[in-house]
Amino acid sequence: YSPIIIDLENGKKVEITGKIDRIDIAKTVEDKYIRIIDYKSSVKNIELNSVYAGLQLQLLTYLDAACKEEDVLPAGVLYFNLIDPIIKSSKNMSEEDIENEIRKKFKMQGLILADINIVKMMDNKLEKGASTIVPAYIGKDGDLSQTKTSGVSRKQFEYLQKYMNKIIKQIS
């Protein structure tokens, strides 16, 4: 993707470059969605207070660059832990239990679009309960849980992208 160019008030420009580890694209009848994934060697999550402080802008910057290059909507910005998980247990576990525990350790963390259809595209086996892939939870009523899902609306993603640009201007 092309670098992001931000015009400063003093007439200068800031050019931001980086390498996106992974971009997933999903299409619906009406729209095309992207999910930005950053590989990490430790467990990491997006903390909105860190975004607010200008300390955690990388994934939002990548999202902004990808959205400007293509006609796409954000589906999520996520971290994927690459460390081989160690499962500890005081009891004997079946292979299935061990696999479930490993899946939990590899679950991506971050922000996703709070849209049940998009969530189900990210985890096509999710019917009810917690996703083993993304930070989402579908309740017994079949709706996306607002308290157990790290979800934001399209408007909130737009706001976060605008805020990221504002912070970069301020710190440049």
PLM regions: where:
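Structural signature of nuclease core domains in nucleic-acid processing machines
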Residues: 1-172
